[in-house]
């Protein structure tokens, strides 16, 4: 936690640095005694809180959260998300939240970007994306989210992507999703589609969706 403080010269001396560390630990729900522990002495949730404290140490406006809850139990995931939301309200933070759990992404995000093989294929406000997905890959992802109602769940139609993944280091000129896309046409093999605004604030990289 103190590393960022030292690197950026944010404390005049060791006493001030140690005080900042304790303040940061308490901000994320830990205690002063945790400052003297080794990493293996923390639980998974506590380690995530330490990571958040480290990020806060340099007084950021923008934080990249790369899979911050993927290895945690569901109850701990909720605690970490609640902490992130609380800090966002209190400090006016902006997050880039990277995750595979689409339900959690919907909960915490204002805008969502869907990526496939390193490229954005769809970008829209959270509610708009979930209510009106346009790219075939986005539709397949959303169809895989389980619904906690057995009557609805058993009758849902999931979109199963067939085909194989292309070689990511030799994609050629065609659309990256061609080999698995259910609406692929001959024109899709000729060029990679650009991200186009198809309605206000809603962007899609698919020549079939943009028509």
What are these regions (language model features)?
Residues 19, 36-38, 156:
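Interfacial catalytic loop of ABC nucleotide-binding domains
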Residues 64, 68, 72, 76-153:
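P-loop NTP-binding/switch modules centered on Walker-like glycine-rich loops
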Residues 57-61:
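A short, proline-enriched helix->beta-strand linker immediately N-terminal to the Walker B motif
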Residues 125-211:
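Charged, flexible cofactor/metal-binding loops and thiol motifs
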Residues 3-9, 115, 145, 178, ...:
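ABC-type ATPase nucleotide-binding domain
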Residues 5-9, 15-33, 142-143:
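Conserved ABC ATPase "signature" region
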Residues 38-42, 46:
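Conserved ABC ATPase signature
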């Amino acid at each position: 936690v103190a590393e960022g403080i030292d690197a950026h010269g944010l404390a005049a001396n060791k006493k001030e640095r140690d005080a900042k560390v304790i303040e940061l630990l308490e901000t994320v729900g830990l205690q002063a005694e945790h400052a003297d522990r080794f990493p293996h002495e923390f639980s998974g949730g506590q380690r995530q809180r330490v990571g958040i404290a480290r990020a806060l140490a340099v007084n950021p406006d923008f934080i990249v959260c790369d899979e911050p809850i993927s290895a945690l139990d569901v109850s701990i995931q909720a605690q970490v998300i609640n902490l992130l939301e609380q800090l966002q309200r209190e400090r006016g933070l902006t997050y880039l939240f990277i995750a595979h759990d689409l339900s959690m992404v919907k909960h915490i995000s204002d805008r969502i970007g869907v990526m496939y093989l390193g490229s954005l294929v769809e970008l829209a406000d959270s509610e708009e994306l979930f209510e009106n997905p346009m790219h075939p890959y986005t539709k397949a992802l959303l169809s895989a989210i389980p619904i906690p109602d057995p009557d609805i769940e058993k009758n849902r139609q999931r979109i199963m992507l067939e085909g194989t993944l292309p070689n990511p280091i030799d994609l050629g000129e065609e659309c990256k999703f061609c080999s698995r896309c259910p609406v692929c046409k001959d024109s899709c093999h000729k060029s990679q589609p650009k991200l186009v605004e198809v309605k206000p604030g809603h962007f899609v990289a698919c020549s079939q969706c943009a028509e």
